[in-house]
């Protein structure tokens, strides 16, 4: 699948923009939209999801790698009857400090620049301790950091990225930090290529909570 995805990189529609925000502190320097024909489609979808991705100019992350991984993650979400209707990647030109996740600095970034949620943000590293490859922040664990609600932060080098993206999206869409020990379940504590399944109960919660929180729309 990864080889096929590389073939459509050149077909992305992208627009170069230079939008000054907050006294030129943060600028969008590139926007890429992924054609919808590359999105996984659920046979009986009941809801639509729009995903917003954010990367940084001069970061270690490559836009192609980010979007390839996101597209590979989509079938793991569509099994819950949720189709992805739109995926856009914006590359931000910011001070270097914003390329590293930490609660106070990342809150400052999202006060300076408004993101569309749910938002996936790809940073060079994290200052959190213990350091995780990804940090998902739903409504229930954003009470002391409301700017970060419904965002996911991925550190460069995150392992098994497509499965990590799907795993963290389920956390945010469900507003639930719980894991599962069920065999081959996507929400096992450690992601792996063989862990792809979600139960009916997990999908029901995802749809109900995400719709209530305005993260997906009912068809």
Feature names for model-found ranges:
Residues 8-18:
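Bacterial N-terminal signal peptides
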Residues 65-72, 161-165, 169, 202:
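Stable alpha-helical elements in mature extracytoplasmic
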Residues 109-114, 126-148:
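Catalytic zinc-binding patch centered on the HExxH motif and its immediate surroundings
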Residues 169-184:
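Catalytic Zn2+-binding segment of zinc metalloproteases
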Residues 146-166:
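Short pre-active-site segment immediately N-terminal to the catalytic Zn-binding motif
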Residues 23-128, 214:
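Propeptide-to-catalytic entry region of secreted or membrane-anchored zinc metalloproteases
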Residues 1-6:
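Positively charged n-region of N-terminal signal peptides that target proteins for export
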């Amino acid at each position: 699948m990864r080889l096929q995805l590389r073939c459509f990189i050149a077909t992305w529609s992208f627009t170069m923009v230079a939008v000054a925000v907050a006294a030129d502190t943060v600028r969008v320097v590139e926007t890429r939209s992924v054609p919808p024909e590359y999105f996984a489609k659920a046979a009986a979808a009941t809801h639509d999801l729009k995903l917003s991705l954010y990367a940084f100019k001069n970061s270690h992350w490559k836009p192609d790698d980010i979007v390839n991984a996101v597209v590979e993650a989509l079938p793991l979400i569509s099994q819950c009857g949720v189709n992805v209707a739109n995926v856009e990647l914006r590359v931000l030109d910011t001070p270097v400090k914003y390329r590293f996740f930490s609660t106070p600095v990342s809150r400052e970034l999202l006060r300076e620049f408004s993101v569309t949620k749910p938002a996936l943000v790809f940073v060079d590293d994290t200052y959190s301790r213990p350091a995780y490859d990804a940090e998902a922040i739903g409504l229930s664990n954003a009470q002391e950091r409301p700017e970060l609600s419904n965002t996911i932060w991925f550190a460069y080098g995150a392992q098994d990225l497509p499965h990590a993206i799907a795993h963290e999206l389920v956390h945010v869409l469900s507003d639930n930090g719980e894991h599962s020990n069920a065999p081959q379940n996507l929400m096992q504590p450690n992601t792996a290529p063989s862990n792809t399944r979600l139960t009916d109960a997990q999908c029901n919660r995802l749809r109900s909570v995400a719709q209530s929180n305005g993260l997906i729309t009912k068809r």
